Structures are given as C-alpha cells and as structure tokens.
C-alpha cells in the first residue's frame, strides 16, 4: 500500500504523546513542536526543503526522535502524577486507533501477526501503568516492566527480518559477497576494454540494460568501475544538469538522476561527449546502430562479446555485453564562432532544441563580437493514423443476454474512441471490464523514416482516476464474462480491495513500441516521494533503425482513462549537414587538452572571437583564466560552462574551487572556538561551585 510516511514509534512513545497533549499548557513548548511537526508532515514543501530544496523526502522526520525521547522521559518522570483522566485518555485513544485501523482495512481486522502482537503489547502496557499505580509499585519496578515490554516489542518488530524461514525480507537477501562480485562483473568485464590514457571521455548504458529492480544502483556502480557514466550526475550536486535535461525533454530525468541514460538519444550522447556505450549482446542489430557508431571488434573482425559473468543469486544480465564506439562524440571543451539566443531557442520543440546545440551554442546572455544565427528546425513531423484495437475478450456464456449487452458496450466504446482519435491520438480508454485498450499509430509512407531516429512527443496528459463505483462495475462485468456468480460476499471483498486500489492508482504508465525498440514512462504518484514530479510533456525515443517501421503501438495502464492534448511523431536524420557540423566542432576542440581532478588546461586558436563551449555542468565554482587573466564564465546550452574567447591563440585554464568552502571553514572554526569557550566557562563555574560547598 502506498504511504506518505511511516512513523515507527513504540507504545510507550504513543502514550507519552497523548500525555503531553493532555497537559498542553504545562508543556506548551513541546506541544508546539508536535504541532509544527504535524503541519510540516502535511506540507510536501517542508520535506523538499529539508531534502536540499529538491523533491520531497521525509527523512527529516528522523529529527522527531529527539522530541519523542524527551516526551517519553517526561512521562516516566510524571508517572506518580498520572490521574484517572490520563488513563482514560490512554485507553480511549488506543481503542480509537484500533477502530481506525479496522475501518481503513475495509471493516476487517486483517492484519499481520506481528502487527497484532504490537497492538496487544500496547494494551498490556496501559494495563501495566494502571496496575502499577493501583498497587503503588516502586518507580524501579515500573521501569523494569516498561523496559521488558519495550524489548518484547523490539523483538516482535525485528522478527520478520531475522527469522530463518522464508518471509518477505528473506528472499531479498543476497549471498555473502554477491553484491561486491556483482558490481565488479556488472559489465561482464567490458570496462577493461576502455582506454586508460589521459584522454577524457564519458560512457553510458543503453536504456533497459539491466532489468532487475536493483538496477537503480547503476548510478553508483559506474563510479566504482571508473567508467565515467553520465548517470553518475545527481541534481543535488548540480542543478544545471537537471535544467539541461528538462530543456530537451529527457523523459528519463527525475529529481535524483537528471540524465540517467539520456533515453538513448543520439544527439544528447554526442553533446555530452559519450565515447563508449555498453549494450546487451542479444540486442545487437547492425541496422539499429546510428551513423557514427560501430561495435568494438576482435582482431578477426568479429564483434567482441564479453561473455556473461553470472553471480550467485541470479545477478546477471543473462546475455553478455558488447561495446559501441561513438565517432561523433564532441570534445569536453571546444570553441564555436556563432551563437543562438535563449529567446530563439525557447521557441523550438524539445527535439529541435537538442539539434540546435549542434548548430551553435545557446547563450543566456549574448556574447559581444560573436555572430548570432537562426536555429534551423531539423525534426520532421511523421503523419500517422490511429487504429484502436478491438476488445478480444469473449464471454464464456456468449448466449446470455447480459453477456451480449456487455459485448455490445465494448464495441461501442471502441467505435466511439476511434471517432475521437480520427485526427490524432487524444484519448486512451478502457473497456467495460477495466482492461485498457491498445492503440496502433500507422505511419504514412514508412519508407521515408528509415535511417532516422523516431521520437514520440506526448503533451497535455490528464489522467482520469478510477472511482469506487467504477471499480465495482468492472468486477461485476468480469464476473459475467467468466460466467461466475457475483455473490454478496464477493462484492464485500471487492469493496475492501477498492479502498486500497483507489489510492494506488494515483499515477499512470504509458509505453510506445516499434518492432525494434520500446520505450515507456511513468507518472509517479505523490506517494512516491523522491521520484515524484508532474509530467505534462514527454519525449519518448523510439530509436534509430534502417528497418522499415510501419506501426508504433501505444499502451497505458493503472488508470481507466488518459486524456492527451497532442501526440506527435518526429524523425531526425544524422547524415549530410549533421555530420559536417559534428566534424566542425570536433576540429575546434581544445588543443593539448589535459584533464585532472579539478583542472582542465589547453590551447584555443580561432580567427574571430568565439564561444568557449563545454559539457561541464555549470557552477560558480569553475574559474576560467585566458592567458593567465581571469575571465568571466556564463551558462551555455542551458546548463554548462561557457565564456567568450578572443580571436587568436590562447592558453586556457579551467579550475574548480568548491563554492563556500572558505566561508564554511571560517564558520566551523568560529563554532569550535565558541564550543571551547563554552566548555571552559562551564568548567570554571563547576569548579567555583565545588569550592563554595
């Protein structure tokens, strides 16, 4: 079940919170903090602020343990002062909690044995408090009893994760040493084929390289393997990367990983200087390799396949790895003698924005002495016709009147939806059973789109969430199709399930595929916390291919209906002018380039003033000197370091200094001095008091 936050507090802390709230005026300071905590919990902006001004994350609530600890100690201190109204509150609020749990579970108390024991221990604790007061037990006896119950609660909580029999957590555990071995063999040793010289390069994986859910770890694995993967960039490190990724409509971008694999987009890889791409061996098809790519080969001329290196526990890509070499990657630093204004750039669609950066760098602030050019629109719109697939499900008893009525309803849904989508895909719906329909976008003149990269742009998405009544109607229709009686008991069970299902379906999933490439994206629900962001426009890369692609199949799930303002197919080629532009940028790369951990040096030579263009994420920490003279930097290409370089030959040096490092060191030093003074002052006061006694 999705959740916004789970607060794991003990029964003792629960009673401490109730006790503090009852004595609100006496504990106004602690109760004020409780209220602030509750209000902050309801506001995603608070969680986002504590998560370095990024997406919401409720890790900040770990601070609440300090408050809960103080409240618990106050409860123990005030044990002798507890009266009958305190005990009534403890009992009444706990019974109310159980009633709420019963209601949200569909008026059943269908909870796990572990949860049931926790509730029993809560009432045992209340009984212990009441009994200790009635029998006038000592404070030590009370504490021993509370500590015993607390230990039992901890044992019960940890039992599910530590039990030796198969449970929820047990199958997720790996064999000892498997994780380390898997990291080292993640690319089947293909990373060893990369050059180990001083030449700078970046790498990436193809989308869907690793299918396991744990694949999100690849963002860190690349750093351990030293492959310079573009997925290792994080938004919390540098906002500029996220701005660039969102600008070009990278659908893989999320708050935690702004680039990921860049959705496999050819031009984005070139712009970021991606030299090597890791691909699964069983997906290799020479006709799907874009211009400028070639597979790494053995001495005999055959494609070099790095055999699969499985690890105990099923950690493996099951096929092996090959390496593509990209000859169109752009230099880390180059100079260009033209620029495109940000205003002209913003008028382009997301695909043409990406292509514009090949024509000339985008400058937020115009650079004097460098000519401005008009960006050319490269992407070609692909005409298509929508075909709604018929509902294939047939009732078991097709002769019944109700079955025939539902079949007729399904046909009407398909026909009406076909009419709605006659001028383009605008509405995706479900049949009367709740099954989402499938849509084929039939391409006009498919031979025109060979040897090009296809993109599907989806904009203005609005999901229609399911209702409780709709959920029950779908289940009733399924019962008719299966010729199964929909009994009262079954309806009650469906109602209970709907209480949870309605909350789960607060996001949706959309996929598009050709015969040679599939792609998808998810609109995460608000309960997804760190990965949640509203998606109103998405670009899905359907890949490059010289094959004939006739149909793009679109599917959706998790919601009964999805309304779309506009669906557009676009195609981009990489021959002719594109290749000339790539070669021109490569020719003007930084000469004698040397890259170290925080410094880049080299020489530029140009007949006119030019724009220094890099794929280094912009930060105020980067300082540029030209011929040992400080030069101001600025943002180029919506997120990277750039600057003006005068005509002629120049020595260029880019060096990174962590912003605020010196100020932070000074503040830390002042804090240490204040701490030392405070310790000395308190020590002096303690010695003075001792001497007076």
Region locations from a protein language model:
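Hydrophobic alpha-helical transmembrane segments
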Residues: 1-11, 82-85
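Hydrophobic, aromatic-rich transmembrane alpha-helices
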Residues: 6-31, 127-133
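Contiguous transmembrane helix-bundle modules in multi-pass membrane proteins
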Residues: 32-45, 51-179, 656-693
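Membrane-proximal, lumen/periplasm-facing interface regions of secretory-pathway glyco-
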Residues: 114-115, 156-188, 526, 530-533, ...
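Extracytoplasmic/lumenal acceptor-recognition loop(s) of multi-pass membrane glycoenzymes
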Residues: 152-173, 194-266, 520, 619
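A cross-kingdom signal targeting lumenal/periplasmic-facing segments of multi-pass membrane
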Residues: 225-342, 364, 368-369, 374
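Catalytic cores of secreted or luminal carbohydrate-active enzymes
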Residues: 270-273, 286-292, 315-424, 557-577
């Amino acid at each position: 079940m999705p959740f916004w936050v789970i607060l794991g507090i003990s029964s003792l802390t629960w009673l401490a919170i109730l006790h503090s709230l009852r004595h609100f005026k006496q504990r106004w300071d602690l109760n004020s903090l409780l209220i602030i905590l509750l209000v902050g919990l309801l506001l995603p902006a608070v969680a986002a602020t504590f998560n370095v001004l990024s997406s919401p994350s409720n890790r900040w609530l770990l601070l609440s343990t300090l408050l809960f600890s103080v409240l618990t100690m106050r409860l123990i201190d005030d044990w002798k002062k507890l009266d009958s109204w305190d005990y009534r509150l403890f009992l009444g609020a706990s019974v109310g909690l159980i009633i709420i749990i019963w209601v949200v579970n569909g008026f059943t108390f269908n909870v796990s044995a572990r949860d049931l024991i926790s509730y029993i221990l809560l009432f045992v604790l209340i009984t212990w408090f009441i009994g200790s007061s009635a029998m006038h037990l000592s404070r030590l006896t009370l504490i021993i009893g509370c500590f015993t119950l607390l230990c039992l609660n901890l044992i019960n909580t940890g039992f599910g994760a530590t039990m030796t029999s198969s449970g929820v957590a047990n199958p997720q555990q790996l064999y000892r040493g498997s994780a380390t071995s898997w990291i080292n063999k993640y690319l089947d040793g293909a990373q060893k084929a990369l050059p180990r010289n001083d030449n700078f390069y970046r790498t990436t994986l193809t989308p869907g390289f690793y299918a396991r859910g744990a694949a999100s770890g690849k963002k860190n694995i690349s750093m351990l393997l030293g492959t310079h993967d573009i997925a290792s960039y994080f938004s919390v490190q540098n906002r500029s990367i996220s701005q660039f990724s969102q600008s070009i409509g990278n659908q893989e971008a999320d708050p935690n990983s702004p680039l990921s694999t860049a959705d496999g987009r050819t031009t984005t890889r070139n712009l970021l200087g991606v030299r090597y791409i890791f691909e699964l061996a069983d997906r290799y098809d020479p006709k799907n390799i874009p211009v400028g790519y070639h597979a790494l080969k053995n001495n005999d001329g055959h494609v070099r396949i790095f055999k699969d290196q499985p690890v105990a526990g099923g950690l493996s890509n099951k096929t092996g790895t090959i390496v593509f070499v990209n000859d169109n990657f752009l230099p880390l630093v180059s100079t260009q003698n033209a620029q495109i204004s940000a205003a002209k750039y913003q008028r382009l669609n997301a695909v043409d924005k990406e292509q514009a950066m090949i024509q000339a760098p985008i400058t937020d602030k115009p650079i004097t002495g460098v000519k401005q050019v008009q960006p050319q629109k490269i992407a070609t719109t692909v005409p298509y016709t929508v075909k709604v697939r018929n509902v294939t499900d047939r009732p078991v008893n097709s002769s019944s009147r109700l079955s025939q009525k539902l079949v007729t309803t399904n046909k009407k849904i398909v026909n009406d939806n076909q009419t709605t989508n006659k001028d383009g895909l605008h509405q995706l719906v479900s049949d009367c059973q709740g099954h989402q329909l499938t849509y084929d976008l039939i391409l006009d003149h498919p031979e025109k789109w060979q040897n090009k990269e296809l993109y599907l742009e989806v904009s203005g998405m609005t999901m229609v969430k399911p209702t409780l009544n709709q959920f029950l109607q779908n289940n009733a229709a399924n019962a008719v199709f299966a010729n199964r009686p929909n009994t009262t008991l079954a309806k009650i069970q469906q109602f209970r399930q709907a209480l949870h299902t309605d909350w789960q379906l607060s996001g949706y999933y959309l996929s598009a595929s050709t015969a040679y490439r599939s792609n998808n994206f998810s609109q995460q629900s608000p309960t997804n916390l760190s990965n949640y962001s509203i998606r109103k426009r998405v670009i899905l890369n359907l890949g490059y291919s010289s094959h004939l692609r006739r149909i793009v199949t679109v599917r959706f799930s998790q919601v009964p209906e999805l309304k779309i303002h506009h669906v557009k197919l676009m195609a981009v080629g990489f021959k002719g002018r594109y290749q000339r532009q790539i070669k021109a940028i490569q020719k003007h790369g930084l000469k004698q380039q040397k890259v170290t951990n925080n410094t880049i040096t080299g020489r530029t030579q140009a007949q006119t003033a030019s724009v220094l263009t890099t794929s280094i994420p912009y930060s105020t920490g980067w300082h540029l000197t030209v011929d040992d003279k400080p030069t101001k930097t600025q943002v180029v290409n919506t997120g990277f370091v750039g600057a003006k370089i005068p005509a002629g030959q120049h020595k260029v040096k880019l060096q990174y200094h962590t912003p605020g490092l010196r100020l932070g060191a000074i503040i830390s030093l002042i804090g240490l001095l204040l701490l030392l003074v405070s310790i000395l002052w308190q020590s002096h006061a303690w010695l003075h008091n001792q001497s007076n006694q």
